Every structure is written in C-alpha cells, then in structure tokens.
Amino acid sequence: MAEQGYDSITIDLQHGLVGYEVATTMLQAMRASAVTPLVRVPWLDPAAIMKSLDAGAYGVICPMINTREEAERLVSYVRYPPNGVRSFGPTRANFSAGSDYGQHADREVLCFAMIETAEAVANLEAITSTPGLDGVYIGPADLTLGLTGRRYPTGFDREEPEVVEVIQTILQEAHKAGIRACLHNGTPAYAAKAIGWGFDLVTISNDVRLLAGAAQASVATARKLIDEQVSPLPASATEGY
C-alpha cells in the first residue's frame, strides 16, 4: 500500500482488526516509503496515544473529541513537557526519526481531533481554537448518526443538504482557526469533491473496501470475457447425444 502513491496511510486501531504489535510492524514497513504514517487510536487514551507515537507514528487521529477539555487532553498526550504530558520513551521512533527525536517531535507529530457528534459541532469553535491542535478530522458516518439519528442510511459520502452544510461549516471553522480540515471518504470521486471544497486531507477508501472492490471487478471482468469467448455449440455438433 505504501508504494502506491499515497501521501499518508492511517493504521486504524479503532475499527480496524489489528492490534498494537501488528501496527508496529506496519509502521516498520512504511518506513521504507515516503508516506506519512498516521494511527487512529481507539479512544482518548494516553497509553494508546503515547505507545503509537513511540512505535513511530507521525500523527494520531483521535475519535469522539466533543469538548475543548477533551481536545486539550489529546494535545497534552501528544506533546512532551512543557507543552504536554507525553512520557519519554520513543522505543522505535528514536531509530526511525533520529536520536534527537525528543527535540523535534513536538514540531513534527500531527494531532487530529475527530468531529463526529452533535456535541462536538456545538463546541466546534472551542475545539478548533485549542492550542497545539493541528487539525480536525470529520467522521461522516458517526456525524450523520449524531445529527439525524437513523433517518438516513449509514455511510461516508454524504449528499444530504443538512449534513453537507455541517461538514462545510466544520471546514470553514478549521481554516478560520488556522488548522487543517480532514474528511473521511468512501470513494475517489467524493474525495476529489472534498478537495474542491477546500479540505486539506481526504481518504479514498480503506484497504478492505479496496481489496473487495478490486476482487469484485476482476471476477466480473473475467466472467464477461469468458462469456464473450464461449459460444454455444451449433445444433449439428450436438446431434446424436
């Protein structure tokens, strides 16, 4: 995946089916490429955040940040004193980023808060203005659930005007605060549309959907080509059987 032209790749420890040990080997593999490795942590948990950074992640995406206080805690877990409370123990980061990692980590490690609830939207200005926060990352599926309940089917690429309006408001508030606006997408087409709106970071899809989509397309193409090449035997060839 890291060799396919992506700017960054996110290891998903929230909804993904991997744990810390596997994530560490994935970070090791990405080290040979030019991609920026990010980790979406399971929750606002200092241990998960700090261990992900110690393993060599260059940024964390934290789900369900709903208040300024939670955003401040997130930043504090990502930054070393005096900017935060991150414990020093960059077991692998020291090797991947240099023995002076502790001196420049705070300037390089990215900290993204996920906005995906009605509460977070209500506290948007307070969250986006949190010192040390690099950006907000919209989770459109949970955001739609939080704003509208089960009125609409779940999914990523939202077209409902009321949801799109909130997504664009989050984008505007992030840029007003001077931080990055990021959006999770399900398709390249919607990702391109989001870039057109002004988003700084977008996803195209996840590995499971990419694999399933490619497999489905390959099977469909093979069946179509086979059907075109194989024609029924003429009636004379089947006489006597």
Regions picked out by a protein language model, each given a short descriptive name:
Residues 1-241:
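Expand to "…catalyze enediolate/carbanion chemistry for C-C bond making/breaking, isomerization
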